[in-house]
Amino acid sequence: MITNSAAVKPNFHLPMRSFELKNRTSPEDIKALRLITAIKTPYLPDGRFDLEAYDDLVNMQIGQGAEGVIVGGTTGEGQLMSWEEHIILIAHTVNCFGGKIKVIGNTGSNSTREAIHATEQGFAVGMHAALHINPYYGKTSLDGMVAHFRSVLSMGPTIIYNVPARTGQDIPPHVIQTLAESVNLAGVKECVGNDRIKQYTDDGIVVWSGNDDQCHDARWGYGATGVVSVASNLVPGLMRELMFGGVNPTLNSKLLPLIDWLFHMPNPIGLNTALAQLGVIRPVFRLPFVPLPVDKRIEFANLVKEIGREHFVGNKVVEVLDDDDFFLVSRY
């Protein structure tokens, strides 16, 4: 039986409001990034951040050539964090790794007020850039969308994230073209597809693929700068090769079964399951996420053997975990 446990609420405190930027970076520095990993946030059995495991994950990314990390994004379960947790994790990442990798904090919100406040604090603790989603659920007009993004673009380098499958609203190209007038727009993380990516690159707008299964073709056939990747949590070296090594359909085909497996259920369910089976994080899930069923866990172990254990993060033998091995945390 999967265990459901409560957690102690962490005693985090937001930094004081500040307009002094600790780690000023130009948008051009962000535009140059080819491999950005949407980093996983691991947990202790009581639901608090497992910072030791987190540091190991980031170090493995640095060691395998990732150039940036998204902190507290969809993959990092920012939607399950308080803002206090959010900012403390960004600050921790900057303090420990900011000299070795670009730290991009997900400080977006469907509330413009919250997005402004979180972004101020993210830059105050030293993040190099902000990631911003368009307002979701309480959707606005296109004019409202432009006003929302302009409110945060003034603060520093910004990546705009378009994923209508999650937000319920596409950011159309003319909105991005309007926002491109801002010197702080580093680019767009685009999940609509490669035709949209080509449209932006033709307009001189930097764009990263947000889809691991399309990123090879996006990079080498449609002009994408690189990828914001989930799969690189597992195989950072191979994803770097995919982004830096030129056209490589053989490697792309080798990775597609793993990528398909990762997104069989909504992200980050597959990734959380995989990292636990690799032994690099504890098998702890913050609800409402739960592990993949046992047949998919077996499938992952087989994929690791087919691709080669040496290409995956960590050095433990991949395991097929039982239901009893997992902790589900509902209060933290």
UniProtKB/Swiss-Prot annotation:
CDD domains for this protein: DHDPS (cd00950)
Pathway: Amino-acid biosynthesis; L-lysine biosynthesis via DAP pathway; (S)-tetrahydrodipicolinate from L-aspartate: step 3/4
Keyword terms of this UniProt record: Amino-acid biosynthesis, Chloroplast, Diaminopimelate biosynthesis, Lyase, Lysine biosynthesis, Plastid, Schiff base, Transit peptide
One Gene Ontology MF term: 4-hydroxy-tetrahydrodipicolinate synthase activity
Subcellular location: Plastid, Chloroplast
SMART domains assigned: DHDPS
Residue(s) at site: Part of a proton relay during catalysis: 74, 137
Catalysed reaction, written as an equation: L-aspartate 4-semialdehyde + pyruvate = (2S,4S)-4-hydroxy-2,3,4,5-tetrahydrodipicolinate + H2O + H(+)
This enzyme's EC code(s): 4.3.3.7
Main location: plastid
Pfam families reported for this sequence: DHDPS
Keyword Lyase: yes
Binding-site residues, pyruvate: 75, 228
Keyword Ion transport: no
GO cellular component: a single term: chloroplast
Catalytic machinery residues: 161 (proton donor/acceptor), 189 (schiff-base intermediate with substrate)
Transmembrane segments: none
Gene Ontology biological-process annotations: diaminopimelate biosynthetic process; lysine biosynthetic process via diaminopimelate
Free-text function comment from the UniProt entry: Catalyzes the condensation of (S)-aspartate-beta-semialdehyde [(S)-ASA] and pyruvate to 4-hydroxy-tetrahydrodipicolinate (HTPA).
Family: Belongs to the DapA family.
Name of protein: 4-hydroxy-tetrahydrodipicolinate synthase, chloroplastic
Organism listed in the record: Glycine max
